[in-house]
């Protein structure tokens, strides 16, 4: 994923910073504990597309 894009993307719910997980191809909002999927290199930023973050 393009680093410039990562710098401007924000969580659509809290407007906070997102963390990119290259291994899982996901964007993570640690504040809301939500995970946004990335499909074919395109972040899916719809609130209905999230899943809860399960921290390991």
Swiss-Prot record:
This is UPF0434 protein CbuG_1535. Pfam families: Trm112p. GO terms for cellular component: cytosol. Belongs to the UPF0434 family. Transmembrane segments: none annotated.
């Amino acid at each position: 994923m393009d680093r410039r894009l990562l710098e401007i993307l924000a969580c659509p719910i809290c407007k906070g910073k997102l963390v990119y997980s290259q291994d899982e191809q996901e964007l993570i909002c640690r504040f809301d504990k939500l995970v946004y999927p990335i499909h074919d290199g395109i972040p899916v930023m719809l609130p209905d597309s999230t899943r809860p973050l399960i921290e390991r």
